[in-house]
Regions:
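Transmembrane alpha-helix/helix-exit interface in multi-pass inner-membrane proteins
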Residues: 347-364
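Active-site rim elements
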Residues: 112-113, 332-334, 400-405
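Conserved oxyanion/phosphate-binding beta-strand-loop segments in alpha/beta enzyme cores
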Residues: 150-159, 164, 182, 186-190, ...
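B-type heme-binding environments
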Residues: 2-166
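Divalent metal-coordination and catalytic microenvironments
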Residues: 81, 122, 160, 220, ...
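Alpha-helical bilayer-embedded segments of polytopic membrane proteins, i.e.
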Residues: 168-215, 242-246, 293, 300-350, ...
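Short coil/turn segments at secondary-structure boundaries
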Residues: 138-139, 170-176, 254-256, 270-274
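Membrane-embedded catalytic scaffold of the fatty acid hydroxylase/desaturase
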Residues: 205-307, 359-485
Length: 488
């Protein structure tokens, strides 16, 4: 059962609140638009011909009604008690349609705040999608969630914002970038001066491996728009780091990584724990029958836009320019494979150590703090651990505050630990070499399978093989979503 609520406009014509007519709305014969048939907008006109104070009549909904709209063809979500119908807009979402679908029928207030940098810009997209709000008697989050825990976490975020914990230190990221470029330049200078013998090749392979891993870690920060004040700058620099310097698709990475963040260790919503194409393992993963579909619809050309292809191709071009004169075409290809082979275990360990040993479950619709803490663990801090993991040893803090610069994680960790202790949540912090260990004897095998899956998925030859042989992984870049990125 729904009732109606009226939002009035201020005298300057600006709406007080977030509602505007839905762009795809239908109109009644009297000229009043109806947002999906569930709300009305009426505008009074004064005698002088000017519009008077417009009013928007919005429906009020119960959680029981909202939770029914959790399908791909019918997606509602709640942000700050406002109800939005994102069904028709999901495919235009810059973060990918699946991110919205994963929260259909749920409260998305905290994940919305966590994943976006400039809320004023993002809210412009929300206004046309507004269809109502929660009824006054309804809590601000689902009834099974602890309102005190949710409010305490939001108070923590406000405290961190007041402490400038989301402020970037440009020197830190400049030094990180300089490290990458110096290592790559040094590798070229060594080959140029000493030749391309085996000892030199092995040595520069290790230099390039370090450069590639650190490049991956920096692009990860850029992907979370935690480096530059404008998301457009971060996206452009991420393309340079991920595609030009590493030869990987940023669209593919973001498409999967954003899903991992919003539904960490939730099967099958988190693509990072889906080993189905290679292994069927774990307690929650049913036996899946899948077929190899060799057809044009699954060829690589279908997945990459020309822009993505150009960016990724530039990686191979610059490698051939740098090392081709010393190794030739075939030798340069082998060098690339060697570096990728050495890099993959390092990156796999960093990305898997904090999640694979933790709780993996089906959808439980937990609050943001509980969901991230139960699915994530930290690794003890040291100068080496910070460098080796790109500060992802503070994975709990990173998942709670993705847009926070990584150099501030260690500062906020004590506050997060204190909040977890207050609400009885286990804050797990392990030594680096024991980070993949877990209580259950089954987890080492699971961790091994996840790591092998990640390795195969990130070796160079797999970029072609997975598109042809593993269509179930859905690695399509969401280029159509990025085309509607906000220009800032």
């Amino acid at each position: 059962m729904t009732t109606k609520l009226e939002d009035k406009h201020a005298g300057n014509g600006d709406l007080v609140g977030e509602g505007q007519p839905y762009l795809g709305e239908k109109y009644q014969t009297n000229g009043k638009p109806v947002a999906n048939g569930r709300g009305e907008i009426s505008v009074k006109q004064e005698a002088n011909g000017k519009c008077g104070v417009p009013r928007k009549s919005l429906n009020m909904y119960s959680w029981q009604e909202i939770q029914k709209h959790n399908q791909k063809a019918d997606q509602w979500l709640v942000i700050n008690r406002k109800v939005y119908d994102v069904t028709g807009w999901a495919n235009k979402h810059p973060g990918g349609s699946r991110v919205l679908n994963h929260y259909a029928g749920e409260d998305a207030t905290d994940v919305f705040r966590a994943m976006h940098l400039d809320l004023d810009i993002v809210k412009l997209y929300l206004k046309p999608l507004l269809i109502g709000e929660l009824a006054p008697e309804e809590p601000s989050q689902e009834r099974h969630k602890s309102s005190q825990l949710v409010e305490d976490f939001r108070e923590l975020r406000r405290t961190l914002e007041a402490m400038n914990m989301f402020k970037v230190n440009p020197v830190f990221f400049f030094l990180h970038f300089a490290q990458i470029m110096i290592l790559e330049t040094l590798a070229w200078l060594i080959v140029w001066h000493f030749g391309s013998g085996w000892p030199v090749t092995i040595f520069i392979s290790f230099l390039l491996t370090i450069s590639q891993v650190q490049c991956f870690l920096l692009q990860h920060d850029l992907g979370h728009i935690s480096v530059f004040p404008k998301s457009k700058w971060s996206r452009l620099m991420q393309k340079f780091m991920m595609s030009h310097l590493k030869g990987l698709s940023t669209c593919w990475w973001n498409h999967r990584h954003f899903q991992h963040h919003v539904k960490t260790n939730i099967y099958p919503k988190d693509p990072d724990i889906n080993t189905g194409p290679l292994f069927v393992n774990g307690y929650l993963k049913p036996v899946q029958v899948w077929e190899m579909k060799l057809c044009p619809g699954h060829l690589t050309v279908n997945y990459f836009s020309l822009q993505e292809f150009a960016w990724v191709s530039s990686f191979y071009i610059h490698y051939f320019i740098m090392f081709g004169p010393f190794y030739g075409i075939f030798g340069t290809i082998l060098l690339i494979f060697l570096v990728k082979f050495l890099e993959s275990p390092w990156v796999a360990y960093v990305t898997q150590m904090s999640h694979v040993p933790m709780r993996i479950s089906k959808e439980e619709n937990r609050d943001w703090l509980s969901a991230q803490v139960l699915a994530t663990c930290n690794v003890e801090q040291s100068f080496f651990n910070d460098w080796f993991t790109g500060h992802l040893n503070f994975q709990i803090e990173h998942h709670l505050f993705p847009t926070m610069p990584c150099h501030n994680y260690h500062k906020v960790a004590p506050l997060v630990r204190s909040l977890c202790a207050k609400h009885g949540l286990q804050y797990v912090n392990k030594p680096l070499l024991k980070s993949l260990s877990a209580r259950s004897s089954h987890f080492p095998l699971t961790a091994c399978l996840h790591t092998i899956h990640w390795l195969v998925n990130h070796l160079p030859i797999s970029y072609l093989l997975r598109d042809i042989c593993m269509p179930s992984m859905d690695v399509r870049p969401f280029r159509e979503h990025q085309q509607c990125n906000v220009k800032k």
